[in-house]
A protein has these predicted regions:
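A short, surface-exposed loop/turn module that caps and links secondary-structure elements
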Residues: 36-65
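Alpha-helix initiation/capping motif
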Residues: 6-7, 50, 93
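Compositionally biased, intrinsically disordered low-complexity segments
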Residues: 30-33, 47, 77
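Enriched for short, Lys/Arg-rich terminal
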Residues: 1, 15-17, 60-103
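Arg/Lys-rich, positively charged N-terminal/basic patches that mediate binding to nucleic acids
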Residues: 1-36
Length: 103
């Protein structure tokens, strides 16, 4: 599966991680699993997907992965140019995740 990240909500946060940190290694491990067609994390019910994701990214499915240091990775499985693609939507802290999901 192809893996791409959102420039605003994922790529900037991922690029800012310390390459030697456990968090970086965990996110890289998730990316590697996704490339091998392994679904990681828990599926988010459609009604619980934030409007922000639906409107900005046009997603109709989403998964979340709990990471060290209270971080969360949100992604969607899409079909882009005829290829199955894991679209990494957002890498966020727990507080921002709760706010985004209305908790």
């Amino acid at each position: 599966m192809r893996v791409v990240g959102d420039r605003k909500d994922f790529d900037i946060a991922f690029a800012g991680l310390n390459k030697n940190s456990a968090l970086f290694r965990d996110v890289q491990g998730i990316i590697d699993k996704l490339k091998n067609d392994v679904i990681v994390g828990k599926r988010i019910k459609y009604k619980q997907i934030p409007k922000y994701y639906k409107k900005r990214h046009g997603v109709d499915n989403a998964y979340h992965v709990y990471l060290p240091e209270g971080m969360r990775l949100i992604y969607s499985i899409t079909n882009c140019e005829g290829k199955r693609t894991a679209f990494l939507i957002e890498l966020t802290d727990h507080k921002s995740y709760d706010r985004r999901f209305g908790y």
